[in-house]
Amino acid sequence: MQGLAFQQRKGSAFYNLFQQLDESDNLSGIVDVGIPRWLRRALRLKNGALDRVRWNAKDQLDPVRFNLMSRRAVRGLECFEGDFNALLQIGSNLDLNSFHQPRAIPAFSFHDNNVYAYVRSLPKGLLPAERIQRAIDFEKRVYDGLSGIFTMSRTLARSFVEDFGLSEDKVHYAGFGSPFAAKSLEGKDYDQQRILFVASHSFERKGGVVLLEAFRQVKKQFPRARLVMVGKEWNIDENGVEVHGFLNKGDPDDLEKYRELFKNASLFVMPSYTEAFGEVFIEAMSHGVPCIGANSGVMPEIVRDNHAGTVVGAGNHTELAETILSYLSNPTALREMGEAGQRAVENEYNWQNVTGRINGVIERYI
């Protein structure tokens, strides 16, 4: 895992996975392959660009960083003193073939994304084709050396098969566990007309600009509607818009405030241009809040397929406004979608399901 302390602080899905594996006595230990902060900054500066989206993309697909992390991970594994009979890595940034293949150790990976899915989220022509191909080649080499691949979503599982040409027998849907237990919706008022948006970065790519434009149209018909935007001080000063800064879910006070915002929300909206997984939709569903996402990436699978809301065309503020108006006009339908989302969390999106699927596959190889 990269950056164990950071993953723990933010309560990431990957940290929760390892915690659940530990509680079920299936975890021998964790090798943290995080690199020093000064080196991470130097690598990021190396990829500098005037356009921040391009800068981030170059950094995400940096083969120098991948190779550096891979070497650190191999050294960490060679020094690991615990007993283990299988290896589970997070993501595709680590090429550990030189360690596990000579030792005949079954190796697996767990993913919320891959390079093909990531590149589809970028503006066309943002990076040279050669840069993208190098990243694809690196990932393909990693996957070819693994015994199996686990994904958070069925959408991503299809990408591994269709884009990388991997065998369906090698790719396994594992799922995702909600960080929040579903609570009773008795007494929840869906007629508050409070719309919640959560994003700690990439405001435009997460659909924030489109949502603001849609909300202006909604406000004309529902004057008491409120748009609550959480994740960063976005410097937005508009009638009916309430902005909260970053809330650290690792801090008890911030976590309580975060959950209270979901509790009071009538509708969660994040029309992101793409989502690797969209954990925040699961958080909303855990609180019985119906969702609107965009018709891209994993959002149709999580939201629409679970009858927890719907998806609209990415970037289409008119369609988004019409959908919000339709939903706010029908609190009964909002409640039904909220209840459906909660059922999905209870029956599907829990870590017991995830670790059960992972352990079931790994046991066939040991």
Q: What do these predicted ranges mean?
A:
Residues 231-267:
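Nucleotide-activated donor-binding/catalytic signature segment of Leloir-type glycosyltransferases, i.e.
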Residues 319, 326, 333-348, 354-360:
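A short, well-ordered alpha-helix in the C-terminal region of glycosyltransferases
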Residues 182-217, 227:
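Conserved donor-binding/catalytic core segment of Leloir-type glycosyltransferases
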Residues 290-293, 303:
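Short hydrophobic beta-strand element within catalytic cores of glycosyltransferases
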Residues 273:
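Aromatic "clamp/platform" in nucleotide-sugar-dependent glycosyltransferases that forms part
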Residues 128-149:
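Membrane-proximal helix-turn-helix segments that form the acceptor-binding/catalytic region
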Residues 155, 177:
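Carbohydrate-associated surface elements
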Residues 305-306, 310-317, 326-332:
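Conserved acidic donor-binding segment of nucleotide-sugar-dependent glycosyltransferases
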